[in-house]
From Swiss-Prot:
GO terms for molecular function: dioxygenase activity; metal ion binding. This is 2-oxoglutarate-Fe(II) type oxidoreductase ppzC. Keywords: Dioxygenase, Iron, Metal-binding, Oxidoreductase. GO terms for biological process: small molecule biosynthetic process. Residues 111-130 are annotated as: Disordered. Pathway: Secondary metabolite biosynthesis. The gene is ppzC. Belongs to the iron/ascorbate-dependent oxidoreductase family. Binds 1 Fe(2+) ion per subunit.
Amino acid sequence: MATDTAVTGAPETTELRLASGNGPVTRTVLRTPVRDALPSEVPLIDISPIFSTCVADRKAVARKIHDAATNIGFFYIQNHRVPSQDIDLAYSASQDFFRQEMEVKVEADAKDGPFDSGYRGPGTQRVNPTEGADLRETYSILYDPMLDPTVPDPANIPEPASRFLHLGRAPFESTATLPHFKDAFVRYFQACLVLARALTRAFALSLDLPESAFDGKVQYPDASLEINFYPPISTGHAVSAPGDADTRVSIGSHTDFLLFTILWQDSNGGLQVLNREGQWIRAIPVEGTFVVNIGDYLQRVTNDKYVSTVHRAQNFSGRERVSMPFFWGFGMHESCQVLRNCCGEDEKSKYDEVKCVDWVSRRLGNLFDLSDKG
């Protein structure tokens, strides 16, 4: 792994190199043991008021989201209205899928590259080009308006949006060995759509915008549900920071590149967040919650007011781990530009307007580049 160690007294630091849509970037990381996050570092927010008819209640939650988004870029949410039964069914179905023989799983292979739904096997993805290939398997479902109850007739979607959409392309026919699989994931996907749209309006409020400010940009979103299967890492010890010997990652150090991510994780843990001080902290599983993290779009539109935070996963639990991230962003036909109210009088915009399809293409190109950049 490519890192440079600097001795500046105690503790030592190392430079973590990351791929981004703007080229390589670095973060300074403390070479200290990974520790559990404090409640103040990754706060728990009760979001039930965002479903209230009272705007004052919704604004109160938006203020808490604003604080979390500016300080760490990660927070837990509870009372999110995603039925526990839907979560349990999706989790059970994911375990059933990944425990099949490889020759069965590859029947659902994502054959058309990064813009396709389906299965990706071990060693096929590398989120961070200076770290090892991700030690995971995945199955993903891209946004399909045929699965979106808010779209009455996909045939009437305007062409600028429809050309980026994936109508009927999820390879559910290749999961026929698991009759319950499709129903479980469609139900969970639809529940995540509802939650993501509610959170989008809460984020708009958190920025002192009308609640509907982003509605048009997510009418036909760039969204995907991904299930990750992480076998236990067999090194026998967790490393404290990039650059230590025998470092292996379940998923490498990265930021998410859309608007935000809604993550469900099982009880085995493994998610680590790089805080502002440069220390890796564990976002341990909290029953009944999701983890929400800010993506690159929200950092860009807020002119760096909100933080798209570096994170990774290392499964040293000794057990199989499953996580189910739901990635949510503006439609691929939309663009992303800095909001006027996020620039002070003498503050310049740090980012040019970018087409969402161009941004996503750049980031996905890094994800599937398995060449050694170390």
